[in-house]
Amino acid sequence: MDATAIILAAGEGTRMKSNHCKVSHKILGKPMVQWIVDATIKAGCSRVVVVIGSHADEMRAFIDGAYANSATKVECVEQTERLGTGHAVKVALEACGIAQGPVVVLNGDLPLITADTVAKFAQTVATGELACTVMTMTPPDPFGYGRIKLGADGQIERIIEQKDCTPEQAATLLECNAGCYAFDGAQLAAHIDEIGNDNAQSEYYLPDMLEILKGHGQAVSIFHCDDYRDGLGVNSRIQLAQLTAIARDRINEHWMAEGVTFIDPTQAWIGPDATIGRDTVVWPQTHLIGHVTVGEECQLGPNSRLTDTTVGSGCTIDETIAIEAVIENGVDCGPRAYLRPGTHMLDGSKAGTHVEIKKSTIGEGSKVPHLSYIGDTTMGAGVNVGAGSITCNYDGVHKHKTVIGKDAFIGSDTMMVAPAQIGDGALVAAGSVITEPVPADALGLGRARQVNIEGWAADYRRRLHEDDEV
């Protein structure tokens, strides 16, 4: 679809009381503005223009980074003077040379709008029969929204703001303005300069385009959202929480329909870019953030947080934090495991209780069951690491690697001082400090030999009592 989306994201968002741009606040781990940009891309818009103003540098850096590799052109245009929504659209048109095709203008704080809604909205002006359509909705409580009054011909007669409604209008006019507009690009470009600023705020308001277009004999109509939630915006932290709950419910209901079990769907937070395989069970307080892929027949949670992580099928992820990790099939993690970026758990491996792994590969069937730190390590298949074992990978300046061969056995409370090399089938005695390579099938022993002194303890206690008598 050769349509352009203009996303208005220049506002201060003062009611958020934040040091950051309003539309950068996250819902399920994803900035609001990214929700709406992604919706326009999925809808088939060929170009997306984000109008920025408040915190412009922060917004530009985010948009440029997030969409650097996007097949759809996503660009930022700065509105240096915040002179209203009409002025913001004019700035976008002039900066990008937009003069034809459908143009949809959306607010950057509408994270719940779907790609399907955007596509249908843009299509309303694609034939040229309508110069503009206004997105409308019928929320359960319309208070605060502008009300739509239609004429006998189905065109918009006027938009009546809440403060201007009579009691009868407030009771009978339940269709509300969602604040989004679709334009025929040629008509928009031809008449945008006719918007005036003769109002109390001396601003240029985009809704004035409706009367301007009607004055030129152009048809103006409405596009009604089937789901009113598509048109809900965020102006406060309270609304941010409310829309987060709606997004959560939508996503969880989708995955339940796809064969995923949620023990309590109100207590699981699944991001929009996550995917979950059928017959997986999601326990309470599970968070999937960013690009997370989970296979079939897994147990997720309780109390697990996965960020940009891939999980295979048949895994147990119990009270685990995993960031930028790859977890293959049949892996057991937790409780209270921490998988840091660069961790790769191969099939059937285990990271158990109070285990931290960073930038390491844990071989097929290998186990790190409890109370260990494994960093910058390549571990072969069939390895067992005893409790309290650590790879000492940092010398104060540089990180060093450890290599543990297949079928090695690392005794409890072992310190492997990197760079360390443990050969295939080697055994490292408990309590060892390993500073030299251990050959394959050898015993590595790096501790003082035990000495038993007969009678020493009894003599020691006797001397303590004698001291007390002095």
Kindly give the residue locations of the regions a language model identified.
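Structural signal for interior beta-strand "rungs" in well-ordered beta-sheet cores
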Residues: 261-445, 450-451
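Short, high-confidence coil segments that cap the C-terminus of an alpha-helix
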Residues: 45, 100, 129-132, 218
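N-terminal nucleotide-binding beta1-loop-alpha1 segment
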Residues: 1-18
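Catalytic-core segments of class I nucleotidyltransferases/pyrophosphorylases
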Residues: 157-249, 253
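Conserved core of the sugar-phosphate nucleotidyltransferase
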Residues: 57, 113-200
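Short beta-strand/turn micro-motifs composed of small residues
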Residues: 9, 52, 107, 136-137
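Short glycine-enriched, charge-decorated loop/helix-capping segments at active-site entrances
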Residues: 20-26, 78, 195-198
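Conserved N-terminal catalytic core of the sugar/cofactor nucleotidyltransferase
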Residues: 1-4, 31-123, 465-466
